[in-house]
UniProtKB/Swiss-Prot annotation:
Keyword annotations of the record: Cytoplasm, Elongation factor, Protein biosynthesis
Family (UniProt): Belongs to the EF-Ts family.
The UniProt record lists the keyword Protein biosynthesis: yes
Region (Involved in Mg(2+) ion dislocation from EF-Tu): 80-83
Role, per record: Associates with the EF-Tu.GDP complex and induces the exchange of GDP to GTP. It remains bound to the aminoacyl-tRNA.EF-Tu.GTP complex up to the GTP hydrolysis stage on the ribosome.
Any one Gene Ontology molecular-function term assigned to this protein's record: translation elongation factor activity
Organism of this sequence: Francisella tularensis subsp. tularensis (strain SCHU S4 / Schu 4)
Principal place of residence: cytoplasm
Domain of life: Bacteria
Protein name in the entry: Elongation factor Ts
Localization (cell): Cytoplasm
HAMAP family the UniProt entry points to: EF_Ts
InterPro entries per UniProt: EF-Ts_dimer_sf (IPR036402), Transl_elong_EFTs/EF1B (IPR001816), Transl_elong_EFTs/EF1B_dimer (IPR014039), Transl_elong_Ts_CS (IPR018101), UBA-like_sf (IPR009060)
Length: 289
C-alpha cells in the first residue's frame, strides 16, 4: 500500500516526533495501520537507542527542581552542544527532573522509571528522543538534598547548584548557590578539607618557605599562615562573597541567622573524556547514523 495520505503521515509525526519520510515508510510497511506503524517505530527507536548507547555523550544540561524541602539535580547528556540547546531536548530534561522529584527518585534507575506528565516513563521518552534526534542521550547523574531552606541556581544550563541552609530564606539560599556556582568551593568549612589534601599543600608550602632562607620559627609561621589562607580559599564559609567581596560568606549567612548545611554543584560533562573528532568525521558519522 503506497497510497498513504498526508493526514495519516502528519498524525504519525505528531505521535512519534519522527521525520516525514520515516513516518511514511513505516505506514507503507504497516499497510496504513497507524497503530502498527507506531509500534514498529517504537521498536526501531529502541534498536537505535541501543546502537547509539556506546557513543560518548559529554554535552548536555543540568536541571534542578526544589520544592517541599527537597531538591533534585540531574545531569542529562547529549553528544553535541547543538542538541543540548535544542528545545525538545531541554523540555525532556525539565520533564525528567519534575518527574524524578515527584517520584522522590534518588538513583538513575528510579529517575528512569519515574512517570512524566504524559504517562510515559523518563526512559521511554529518552529512547523516543534518541530515535527522533539521532544522538546518544543519557541521564548521567542524580543528586538529592533535603533541608529547611533550599536555594537553586543554574548558570547557562551548564552549572547547577543547590544550597541547603538551616534558617534564613530562599533568597539567601539562592545567593549562596550563585556564589558556589561562581567560586566553586571544595567544602562548606575548612575543617572538612580532606587531611591528605591539607598534607600535600603543607608539603608544597614548606618547600617554598625553606627557599626563603629565613629562621625555622619564621618558616613555621609562614606555613601556618599559608595553610589558613588555602583553607579560606577552598572552603565556602571562608570565601569572599561574590556579590560583596567586603564580607565573607560565613558572615553573610550568620547575620541572617542562618547556617550552611550543605551544597551540591554539578558541571555538565565533568569527568567525561571527550572523543576528539574533526568536523568532517563528525558530519560523516551523523550521515551514517
Amino acid at each position: 500500500m503506497s497510497n498513504i495520505s498526508a493526514k495519516l503521515v502528519k498524525e504519525l509525526r505528531e505521535r512519534t516526533g519522527a521525520g516525514m519520510m520515516e513516518c511514511k515508510k513505516a505506514l507503507v510497511a504497516a499497510a496504513g495501520d497507524i497503530e502498527k506503524a507506531a509500534e514498529e517505530m517504537r521498536i526501531s527507536g529502541q534498536a537505535k537507542a541501543d546502537k547509539k548507547a556506546s557513543r560518548v555523550a559529554a554535552e548536555g544540561v543540568i536541571e534542578v527542581y526544589a520544592a517541599d524541602g527537597r531538591a533534585i539535580l540531574l545531569e542529562i547528556n547529549s553528544e553535541t552542544d547543538f542538541v543540548a540547546r535544542d528545545e525538545t531536548f531541554k523540555k525532556f530534561a525539565q520533564e525528567a527532573v519534575k518527574a524524578a522529584h515527584a517520584a522522590n527518585a534518588k538513583t538513575i534507575e528510579e529517575v528512569l522509571a519515574a512517570k512524566t506528565s504524559n504517562g510515559e516513563t523518563v526512559e521511554e521518552v529518552r529512547k523516543s528522543l534518541i530515535a527522533k534526534i539521532g544522538e546518544n542521550i543519557q541521564v548521567r547523574r542524580v543528586k538529592t538534598v533535603e533541608a529547611e531552606t533550599l536555594g537553586a541556581y543554574i548558570h547557562g544550563s551548564k552549572i547547577g547548584v543547590v544550597a541547603a541552609l538551616e534558617g534564613g530564606d530562599e533568597d539567601l539560599a539562592k545567593d549562596v548557590a550563585m556564589h558556589v556556582a561562581a567560586a566553586n568551593p571544595m567544602v562548606v568549612s575548612g575543617d572538612q578539607v580532606p587531611a591528605d589534601v591539607v598534607a600535600k599543600e603543607k608539603e608544597i608550602f614548606t618547600a617554598q618557605a625553606k627557599e626563603s632562607g629565613k629562621p625555622a620559627e619564621i618558616i613555621e609561621k609562614m606555613i601556618v599562615g599559608r595553610i589558613r589562607k588555602f583553607l579560606d580559599e577552598v572552603a565556602l564559609l571562608g570565601q569572599d562573597f561574590v556579590k560583596d567581596p567586603a564580607i565573607k560568606v560565613e558572615k553573610l549567612v550568620k547575620d541572617k541567622g542562618a547556617k550552611v548545611v550543605n551544597f551540591i554543584r554539578l558541571d555538565v560533562g565533568e569527568g567525561i573524556e571527550k572523543k576528539e573528532e574533526d568536523f568532517a568525521a563528525e558530519v560523516m558519522s551523523q550521515i551514517k547514523g
